[in-house]
């Protein structure tokens, strides 16, 4: 049996230097994101979202990035889910992208806000019909006795709305407004490259190198 402690990989694909990155971290993220797409990284927009409840208990789960602009990173979910309740109590959150094929990670820290109703409507109506009905059928994070209950709810809403369900009031988008963004590039001997962008009071960004 393979020892877990003996599982390791030495990284040597690329390097990362302050002289080579964009002064704006959102543009730098887009550069890396596009490279990950070209490299055919699976689920390139999958990201870990970390939140904290009022008692300080952290939670993490995978969600999907659905928009990126000069304001930040947008994802969509059920506002009444555990993460929605945690974000309502404490809007500070973190994201992590891990593109293992490129030996890269991106960590994002900031404050989360709800996107506009129009943004939530536009994305909701772009989704496949099954996903739109699922947003009605699933009381996300609540206990259900079995899968049949979910399927019955989905059938009920399909009968009720047909192929034109409206967006549920409990479902919509969030945008994480970044305050810090770290780009991590794996390097040999665990001497990885880490560059962190820190938002300044004037809205600009300061870049520092961190020890691995």
Curated annotation (Swiss-Prot):
Show the Pfam families listed in the entry.
Answer: PNP_phzG_C, PNPOx_N
Catalyses which reaction?
pyridoxamine 5'-phosphate + O2 + H2O = pyridoxal 5'-phosphate + H2O2 + NH4(+); pyridoxine 5'-phosphate + O2 = pyridoxal 5'-phosphate + H2O2
**GO MF term list:** FMN binding; pyridoxamine phosphate oxidase activity
Write out the pathway annotation from the protein's UniProt entry.
Cofactor metabolism; pyridoxal 5'-phosphate salvage; pyridoxal 5'-phosphate from pyridoxamine 5'-phosphate: step 1/1; Cofactor metabolism; pyridoxal 5'-phosphate salvage; pyridoxal 5'-phosphate from pyridoxine 5'-phosphate: step 1/1
Question: InterPro entries this protein is in?
Answer: Pyridox_Oxase (IPR000659), Pyridox_Oxase_CS (IPR019740), Pyridox_Oxase_N (IPR011576), Pyridoxamine_oxidase_dimer_C (IPR019576), Split_barrel_FMN-bd (IPR012349)
Q: Which residues cross the membrane?
A: none
Which cofactors are required for activity? Answer: FMN
What does the UniProt keyword field contain? Flavoprotein, FMN, Oxidoreductase, Pyridoxine biosynthesis
Q: Does the keyword Flavoprotein apply?
A: yes
Q: What is the enzyme's main class?
A: oxidoreductase
Domain of life, source organism: Bacteria
Query: Could you give the cofactor binding note from the entry?
Result: Binds 1 FMN per subunit.
Q: Where substrate is bound, by residue?
A: 8-11, 66, 123, 127, 131, 190-192
Q: Which family does it belong to?
A: Belongs to the pyridoxamine 5'-phosphate oxidase family.
UniProt subunit comment: Homodimer.
Protein's recorded name:
Pyridoxine/pyridoxamine 5'-phosphate oxidase 1
